[in-house]
């Protein structure tokens, strides 16, 4: 499978953060039962547990401002991609907080799912 990782990473991040910022409950289709989220040091496994964590975050209005997106192939066999995102997280109108997030994207037919998702505030 030939992948333009930079285009894939950009399109994925635009979709992910737009969905996160408007309705986090709709992110479940991006994960599988074996997917894992590490959110500021706490691990959550499976699509349902991940969405429960994201929906349960203690803020209302949120906006991600992406600074940089870097992508690389994750294996020589092809298809999967590692994505590193850095930016600022604006929550409920407070001062922006710097963050980093890593996604490991795995091909699934004509689309991709998130196998690993690691989020860390850099404050």
From Swiss-Prot:
Cell compartments where the protein resides: Cytoplasm
Pfam families in the record: NTF2
Keyword Protein transport on entry? yes
Locate the NTF2 domain: which residues?
8-121
Gene Ontology cellular component terms for the protein in this record: cytoplasm; nuclear pore central transport channel
Quote the CDD domains the UniProt record gives.
Answer: NTF2
Keyword annotations for this protein?
Answer: Cytoplasm, Protein transport, Transport
Q: Name one GO molecular function term.
A: small GTPase binding
Q: Which domain of life is it from?
A: Eukaryota
Q: Name one GO biological process term.
A: protein import into nucleus
Output the InterPro entries linked to this UniProt entry. NTF2, NTF2-like_dom_sf, NTF2_dom, Nuclear_transport_factor_2_euk
The UniProt entry lists the main location of this chain as cytoplasm
Tagged with keyword Protein transport: yes
The job of this chain, per UniProt, is described as: Facilitates protein transport into the nucleus. Could be part of a multicomponent system of cytosolic factors that assemble at the pore complex during nuclear import.
UniProt protein name: Nuclear transport factor 2
Species name for this entry?
A: Yarrowia lipolytica (strain CLIB 122 / E 150) (Yeast)
Q: What is the lineage of its organism?
A: Eukaryota, Fungi, Dikarya, Ascomycota, Saccharomycotina
Gene of this entry: NTF2
């Amino acid at each position: 499978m030939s992948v333009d990782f930079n285009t894939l990473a950009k399109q994925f991040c635009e979709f992910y953060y737009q969905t996160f910022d408007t309705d986090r409950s709709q992110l479940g289709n991006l994960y599988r039962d074996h997917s894992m989220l590490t959110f500021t040091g706490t691990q959550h496994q499976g699509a349902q547990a991940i969405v429960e964590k994201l929906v349960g975050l203690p803020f209302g209005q949120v906006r991600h401002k992406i600074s940089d997106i870097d992508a690389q192939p994750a294996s020589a066999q092809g298809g999967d991609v590692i994505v590193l995102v850095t930016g600022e997280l604006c929550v409920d109108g407070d001062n922006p907080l710097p963050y980093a997030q890593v996604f490991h994207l795995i091909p699934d037919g004509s689309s991709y799912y998130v196998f690993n998702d690691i989020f860390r505030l850099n404050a």
